[in-house]
Amino acid sequence: MLPTENRLRRREDFATAVRRGRRAGRPLLVVHLRSGDTDPHVTGETVPPPRAGFVVSKAVGGAVVRTAVKRRLRHLVRDRLAQLPPGSLVVVRALPGAGDADHAQLARDLDAALQRLLGGGAR
Protein backbone atom coordinates (compact mmCIF):
# COMPACT_ATOMS: atom_id res chain seq x y z
CA MET A 1 0.00 0.00 0.00
CA LEU A 2 1.18 3.51 -0.75
CA PRO A 3 1.87 5.70 2.28
CA THR A 4 -0.76 8.41 2.81
CA GLU A 5 1.61 11.26 1.98
CA ASN A 6 2.39 9.67 -1.40
CA ARG A 7 -1.21 9.32 -2.59
CA LEU A 8 -2.72 11.52 -5.24
CA ARG A 9 -6.36 12.15 -4.32
CA ARG A 10 -7.69 15.46 -5.60
CA ARG A 11 -9.22 15.74 -9.04
CA GLU A 12 -7.20 18.93 -9.67
CA ASP A 13 -3.95 17.09 -8.97
CA PHE A 14 -4.83 14.32 -11.42
CA ALA A 15 -5.74 16.96 -14.02
CA THR A 16 -2.48 18.85 -13.45
CA ALA A 17 -0.37 15.74 -13.89
CA VAL A 18 -2.22 14.63 -17.02
CA ARG A 19 -2.59 18.02 -18.72
CA ARG A 20 0.67 19.74 -17.77
CA GLY A 21 2.96 16.78 -17.27
CA ARG A 22 5.00 14.74 -19.71
CA ARG A 23 3.71 11.40 -20.97
CA ALA A 24 5.32 8.08 -21.80
CA GLY A 25 3.22 5.32 -23.31
CA ARG A 26 3.89 1.60 -23.23
CA PRO A 27 1.75 -1.33 -24.44
CA LEU A 28 0.15 -1.91 -21.02
CA LEU A 29 0.13 1.54 -19.44
CA VAL A 30 0.69 5.26 -19.85
CA VAL A 31 2.61 7.26 -17.23
CA HIS A 32 2.06 11.01 -16.80
CA LEU A 33 4.73 12.87 -14.79
CA ARG A 34 4.65 16.47 -13.58
CA SER A 35 8.10 17.04 -12.09
CA GLY A 36 9.04 19.24 -9.16
CA ASP A 37 5.61 20.71 -8.70
CA THR A 38 5.04 22.50 -5.42
CA ASP A 39 1.95 21.29 -3.65
CA PRO A 40 -0.55 24.18 -3.39
CA HIS A 41 -2.39 22.34 -0.59
CA VAL A 42 0.59 22.23 1.79
CA THR A 43 1.88 25.35 3.51
CA GLY A 44 5.40 25.79 4.76
CA GLU A 45 8.92 25.41 3.45
CA THR A 46 9.14 21.62 3.47
CA VAL A 47 9.76 19.77 0.24
CA PRO A 48 6.64 17.77 -0.64
CA PRO A 49 7.06 14.06 -1.33
CA PRO A 50 6.30 12.58 -4.74
CA ARG A 51 2.66 11.56 -5.09
CA ALA A 52 1.09 8.93 -7.33
CA GLY A 53 -2.41 8.16 -8.54
CA PHE A 54 -3.90 5.45 -10.72
CA VAL A 55 -6.56 5.32 -13.42
CA VAL A 56 -7.95 1.91 -14.35
CA SER A 57 -11.03 2.10 -16.58
CA LYS A 58 -13.70 -0.50 -17.23
CA ALA A 59 -11.96 -1.30 -20.53
CA VAL A 60 -9.33 -3.15 -18.46
CA GLY A 61 -11.89 -5.63 -17.13
CA GLY A 62 -14.45 -6.23 -14.43
CA ALA A 63 -14.23 -4.93 -10.89
CA VAL A 64 -12.09 -7.81 -9.64
CA VAL A 65 -9.59 -7.42 -12.50
CA ARG A 66 -9.43 -3.63 -12.12
CA THR A 67 -8.78 -3.92 -8.39
CA ALA A 68 -6.02 -6.48 -8.98
CA VAL A 69 -4.37 -4.21 -11.56
CA LYS A 70 -4.56 -1.22 -9.18
CA ARG A 71 -2.98 -3.23 -6.37
CA ARG A 72 -0.15 -4.41 -8.61
CA LEU A 73 0.51 -0.89 -9.87
CA ARG A 74 0.44 0.57 -6.34
CA HIS A 75 2.97 -2.01 -5.20
CA LEU A 76 5.23 -1.34 -8.19
CA VAL A 77 5.10 2.44 -7.77
CA ARG A 78 5.73 2.21 -4.02
CA ASP A 79 9.01 0.43 -4.73
CA ARG A 80 10.02 3.18 -7.19
CA LEU A 81 9.13 6.31 -5.17
CA ALA A 82 12.80 6.99 -4.41
CA GLN A 83 13.48 7.44 -8.15
CA LEU A 84 10.93 10.25 -8.44
CA PRO A 85 11.87 13.90 -7.88
CA PRO A 86 10.45 15.53 -4.72
CA GLY A 87 7.11 17.19 -5.31
CA SER A 88 6.39 15.32 -8.51
CA LEU A 89 2.93 14.12 -9.47
CA VAL A 90 2.60 10.76 -11.24
CA VAL A 91 -0.53 9.30 -12.79
CA VAL A 92 -0.36 5.73 -14.06
CA ARG A 93 -3.15 4.91 -16.51
CA ALA A 94 -3.70 1.23 -17.23
CA LEU A 95 -4.56 0.25 -20.80
CA PRO A 96 -6.90 -2.64 -21.69
CA GLY A 97 -4.09 -5.21 -21.96
CA ALA A 98 -3.06 -4.61 -18.34
CA GLY A 99 -5.83 -6.88 -17.09
CA ASP A 100 -4.23 -9.92 -18.74
CA ALA A 101 -0.63 -8.98 -17.91
CA ASP A 102 1.35 -10.48 -15.07
CA HIS A 103 3.34 -8.59 -12.44
CA ALA A 104 6.64 -8.82 -14.36
CA GLN A 105 5.13 -7.40 -17.56
CA LEU A 106 3.61 -4.45 -15.69
CA ALA A 107 6.93 -3.85 -13.91
CA ARG A 108 8.83 -3.88 -17.21
CA ASP A 109 6.48 -1.35 -18.82
CA LEU A 110 6.44 0.89 -15.75
CA ASP A 111 10.25 0.88 -15.54
CA ALA A 112 10.58 1.70 -19.24
CA ALA A 113 8.08 4.57 -19.01
CA LEU A 114 9.70 6.05 -15.90
CA GLN A 115 13.15 5.71 -17.44
CA ARG A 116 12.00 7.65 -20.47
CA LEU A 117 10.32 10.38 -18.40
CA LEU A 118 13.23 10.79 -16.00
CA GLY A 119 15.67 11.39 -18.82
CA GLY A 120 17.28 8.03 -19.41
CA GLY A 121 15.53 6.82 -22.52
CA ALA A 122 15.19 7.79 -26.16
CA ARG A 123 11.88 8.14 -27.97
From Swiss-Prot:
**Gene Ontology BP terms:** tRNA 5'-leader removal
Record function comment: RNaseP catalyzes the removal of the 5'-leader sequence from pre-tRNA to produce the mature 5'-terminus. It can also cleave other RNA substrates such as 4.5S RNA. The protein component plays an auxiliary but essential role in vivo by binding to the 5'-leader sequence and broadening the substrate specificity of the ribozyme.
InterPro entries to which the protein is assigned, alphabetical: Ribosomal_Su5_D2-typ_SF, Ribsml_uS5_D2-typ_fold_subgr, RNase_P
Q: Cellular component GO terms, alphabetically?
A: ribonuclease P complex
What does the record note on quaternary structure? Consists of a catalytic RNA component (M1 or rnpB) and a protein subunit.
Query: What Gene3D superfamilies does the record tag this protein with?
Result: 3.30.230.10
Q: Which UniProt keywords apply?
A: Endonuclease, Hydrolase, Nuclease, RNA-binding, tRNA processing
Identification of the protein by name:
Ribonuclease P protein component
The lineage's top-level taxon is: Bacteria
Keyword check for Hydrolase: yes
Instruction: Name the protein family.
Output: Belongs to the RnpA family.
Record EC number: 3.1.26.5
Q: Which reaction does it catalyse?
A: Endonucleolytic cleavage of RNA, removing 5'-extranucleotides from tRNA precursor
Question: Can you name one GO molecular function term for this protein?
Answer: tRNA binding
